[in-house]
C-alpha cells in the first residue's frame, strides 16, 4: 500500500459475504409489513406534497419527470432545495441524512465551504468555461500524478461515461486489437459498447435497446471472481488470443456495482497477472473508488498498477463535468489534443471537458481531502454504519446482509440485483424483489435517510457519530416492522 493510509480498515471476508448473499436470494422475501408500508406511503402524501406536485408537472416536460437515474424514487422523487454537510432538505422543509452523496463524489460533505469559496472566486475572475488552456488543468494533473504514479499523463473529460469511452478507444488504438473484456454486473457508463452485462452477470445485451448489435461485437463478459474456470478470464483471454487478441480488461476494483458483488482480496492482482500473460491492457474504473478509498485510489490499496485509470465523481469534488482518464505515457499519447498528424490518434473531445470550474473544483477538493484525511473519516463512518446495521439485522433475526469497503456501504434486503439470471425462477422473482427494494428505499426516506436505491450508502467526512446514530435509529424503526418468515 506504499505507506499511504486508506479508508478500508479491514478487508471483509468475501466468501462469507457471498454465501450470505446467496442465502438471501434463496430465502423467501421479508418485506415491510403491509400496514406499516401503507403508513410510509401516506407520509409521502402528507409531508412531501410539494415534491409530488413538482414531479407531476415535470412529467409534462421531462421524460419520467426527472433527469437523473439516481432520482427515480418510489413512490415519487423528492425535490431537493438545499444541501449542506451531511444533510439534504426538500422543498417541503423535510431534512434528510444524505447517504446518497450524489452517487459518491461529495466525500467532504455537501457544499464544502473551502472548495465553494475557491470555485466562486474563479468563476468571478475568469469564467466557468473558456475553451482555452487554464493553469488548473496542469495543477490538477500534477496533483493526481503525485498520489497515483501510474497516472503519468491525465486527460480531463466531461463524465465517467466519456472517460470509459476514451479508455477503450485509447486501448484499441495503442494495441491495434478490438476486443474489450468487462466483468458481468459491472457498470462502466452508458456508451454503446458498455451497455452489456449490466447489473446482473450473464445478462449480455438484455438492456441494449437502441444499440445496433454490431456495437457490441467487440465486448466480452466474464463473471466476477472467475479467473481460472473453463469460462473464466484466462480461458477467455486465451480464446481471444487466437482471434487477434484482447485490447483491454476493464474492472471495478472493489467488484461490480461498487462492490455490490464483492471480489476477493487478491482478485485484482490475479487479473493483472492474466492481462500480462495474454498481452492485454488493464483498465481500472476508479470513478467511485478514486480518492474515496484513499488518495492512492483502489490501485494503491491493492498495490496493483493498472495501465489506464478512469476517473469521475471525486475528481471534480461534486461539481459538474467530472471525468478523466490517466495512465501510461505511451498509451495516453494516443489522446493528444490539437492538430498533430502522422501517427494514430484516438479522437476525443468535449466543449465542457477540463473547464476552469471543474479543474479548480477537483484541485481544491483533492487538496482538502488530503488536508483533512476525509477518506479516513468517511471510512470510519462507513464502518460505524455497517457495524450498526449488522447489529440491527441480528437483533431482529433478519436474513439481510450489510457490509462495507470503507465509506462505500452495502445493505442487501431483497437481493434484487443478486439473482442468478440462469435460475429457472429468476425472471419471476425479479419484479417482486425489485418492488421490495423500492419499498425499502421509500421507508428509509420516510425515516429521514436518503440512500442509493435502498441498497447502497456512501458516507462522507461530515457524517459524525451523532449523524450516524440518528440514521441507525431510523433503520431500526424500519427493521422492527418486517413480515415474519
Question: Residue ranges of each PLM-predicted region?
Answer:
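Conserved N-terminal phosphate-binding loop of PLP-dependent enzymes in the Aspartate aminotransferase
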Residues: 2-485
Amino acid at each position: 500500500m506504499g505507506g499511504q493510509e486508506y479508508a478500508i480498515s479491514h478487508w471483509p471476508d468475501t466468501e462469507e459475504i457471498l454465501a450470505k448473499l446467496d442465502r438471501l436470494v434463496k430465502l423467501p422475501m421479508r418485506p415491510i409489513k403491509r400496514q406499516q408500508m401503507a403508513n410510509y406511503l401516506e407520509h409521502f402524501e402528507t409531508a412531501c406534497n410539494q415534491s409530488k406536485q413538482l414531479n407531476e408537472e415535470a412529467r409534462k416536460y421531462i421524460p419520467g419527470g426527472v433527469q437523473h437515474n439516481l432520482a427515480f424514487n418510489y413512490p415519487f422523487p423528492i425535490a431537493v432545495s438545499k444541501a449542506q454537510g451531511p444533510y439534504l432538505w426538500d422543498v417541503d422543509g423535510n431534512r434528510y441524512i444524505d447517504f446518497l452523496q450524489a452517487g459518491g463524489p461529495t466525500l467532504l460533505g455537501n457544499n464544502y465551504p473551502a472548495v465553494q469559496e475557491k470555485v466562486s472566486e474563479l468563476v468571478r475572475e475568469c469564467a466557468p468555461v473558456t475553451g482555452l488552456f487554464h493553469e488548473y488543468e496542469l495543477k490538477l494533473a500534477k496533483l493526481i500524478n503525485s498520489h497515483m504514479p501510474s497516472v503519468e499523463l491525465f486527460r480531463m473529460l466531461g463524465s465517467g461515461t466519456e472517460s470509459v469511452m476514451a479508455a477503450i478507444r485509447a486501448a484499441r488504438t495503442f494495441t491495434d486489437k478490438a476486443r474489450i473484456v468487462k466483468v458481468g454486473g459491472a457498470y462502466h457508463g452508458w456508451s454503446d459498447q458498455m451497455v452489456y452485462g449490466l447489473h446482473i452477470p450473464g445478462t449480455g445485451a438484455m438492456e441494449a435497446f437502441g444499440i445496433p448489435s454490431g456495437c457490441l461485437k467487440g465486448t466480452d463478459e466474464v463473471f466476477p471472481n472467475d479467473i481460472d474456470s473453463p469460462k473464466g478470464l484466462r480461458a477467455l483471454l486465451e480464446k481471444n488470443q487466437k482471434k487477434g487478441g484482447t485490447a483491454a480488461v476493464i474492472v471495478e476494483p472493489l467488484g461490480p456495482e461498487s462492490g455490490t458483488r464483492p471480489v476477493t482480496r487478491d482478485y485484482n492482482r490475479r487479473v493483472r497477472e492474466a492481462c500480462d500473460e495474454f498481452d492485454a491492457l488493464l483498465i481500472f474504473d476508479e470513478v467511485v473508488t478514486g480518492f474515496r478509498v484513499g488518495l492512492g485510489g483502489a490501485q494503491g490499496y491493492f498495490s496493483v498498477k493498472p495501465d489506464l485509470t478512469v476517473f469521475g465523481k471525486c475528481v471534480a469534488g461534486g461539481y459538474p463535468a467530472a471525468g478523466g482518464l490517466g495512465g501510461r505515457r505511451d498509451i495516453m499519447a494516443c489522446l493528444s489534443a490539437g492538430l498533430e498528424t502522422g501517427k494514430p490518434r484516438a479522437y476525443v473531445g468535449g466543449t465542457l471537458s477540463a473547464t476552469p470550474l471543474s479543474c479548480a473544483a477537483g484541485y481544491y477538493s483533492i487538496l482538502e481531502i488530503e488536508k483533512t484525511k476525509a477518506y479516513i473519516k468517511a471510512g470510519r463512518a462507513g464502518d460505524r454504519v455497517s457495524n450498526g446495521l449488522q447489529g440491527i439485522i441480528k437483533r431482529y433475526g433478519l436474513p439481510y446482509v450489510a457490509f462495507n469497503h470503507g465509506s462505500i456501504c452495502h445493505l442487501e434486503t431483497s437481493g434484487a440485483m443478486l439473482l442468478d439470471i440462469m435460475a429457472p425462477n429468476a425472471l419471476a422473482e425479479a419484479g417482486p424483489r425489485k418492488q421490495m427494494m423500492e419499498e425499502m428505499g421509500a421507508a428509509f426516506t420516510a425515516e429521514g435517510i436518503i440512500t442509493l436505491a435502498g441498497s447502497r450508502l456512501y458516507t462522507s467526512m461530515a457524517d459524525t457519530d451523532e449523524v450516524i446514530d440518528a440514521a441507525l435509529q431510523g433503520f431500526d424503526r424500519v427493521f422492527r416492522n418486517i413480515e415474519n418468515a
